[in-house]
Amino acid sequence: MTLLRGDDFFTSRAVTVAVEPRTPQTAFPEHYHDFWEIVLVEQGAGVHVFNDQPYALCSGSVFFVRDNDRHLFEDVEGLCLTNMLYRSPRGFRFLSDIAAFLPYGPNGEWQGQWQVNAAGMQQLKQSLNSLAGLAQSDAPEAIAASESLFLQILVQLRQHCFQTEGNGSERQGVQALLGWLQNNYSEEVNWGGLADQFSLPLRTLHRQLKQHTGMTPQRYLNRLRLLEARRRLQQSDDSITTIAHACGFSDSNHFSTQFRKAFSQAPKSLRHQAFSREE
């Protein structure tokens, strides 16, 4: 597995933050870093596999990545994102500790998958452009200004994001709906009911989901289900039928057809490959 080193991305060893745009982000194999980063997806689609857990990417997706996390990008389609790098939560010159602004849950668990709304993303892009300029200098005043702006960006993320691990029931709009789908993909979905739940006209729901994900709502839902099914096939001993039902497919034959269409491989073949690698 590849280790990405901060010396290849930060302007100098004195600099504590960096901005790395990826326009586009191509498929990239599993890797880890000796620094921390925040990944903000501006547009496009793809799959982000984070510590063996797959996530479907869309505009507004945000991922907080620690130095001990493993991740990769695959199945990308017009994916554009920006990486905001920092040494560590305590690796700043003028900030003492940013842990309070990082996505720790009430019991200390890491909740690093967020969704940001469109207005928030526009504000963040402006701040990131300014930060990219400041991060080119290792003058003390530039480092102080870049760390100050970095903290402002963390505050902006808090204001405009929410964790996709939550059920999103208290929030409205397409971003909340995306978070709900990430957490409830296995349920039977009534799009009209969800439109009411998230205060969206049904036609608006279909149009905005297509804009954010590049897919129709049903195709995006199936994508979430298939990604989770692939993970379970590789990591569990459950039968293919059990996995299909657990991921929201009522018919295992239909599941197998959809799986082959998405991954050019039958579920049984993937299961066999996964077990062969372990032997």
Curated annotation (Swiss-Prot):
Gene3D superfamilies listed in its UniProt record: Homeodomain-like, Jelly Rolls
InterPro entries in UniProt: AraC-bd (IPR003313), AraC_XylS_family_regulators (IPR050204), Homeodomain-like_sf (IPR009057), HTH-like (IPR037923), HTH_AraC (IPR018060), HTH_AraC-typ_CS (IPR018062), RhaR_RhaS-like_N (IPR047220), RmlC-like_jellyroll (IPR014710)
DNA-binding residue intervals: 192-213, 240-263
GO CC, any one term: cytoplasm
UniProt keyword terms in alphabetical order: Activator, Cytoplasm, DNA-binding, Repeat, Rhamnose metabolism, Transcription, Transcription regulation
PROSITE patterns xrefs: HTH_ARAC_FAMILY_1, HTH_ARAC_FAMILY_2
GO molecular function, a single term: DNA-binding transcription factor activity
Subunit structure: Binds DNA as a dimer.
Protein's name in the database: HTH-type transcriptional activator RhaS
Pfam family, one: AraC_binding
Entry keyword annotation includes DNA-binding: yes
Positions bearing the site annotation: Interaction with sigma-70: 251
Gene: rhaS
Signal sequence residues: none
Domain HTH araC/xylS-type: 175-273
PANTHER family referenced in this protein's UniProt entry, alphabetically: HTH-TYPE TRANSCRIPTIONAL ACTIVATOR RHAS, HTH-TYPE TRANSCRIPTIONAL ACTIVATOR RHAS-RELATED
Domain of life the protein comes from: Bacteria
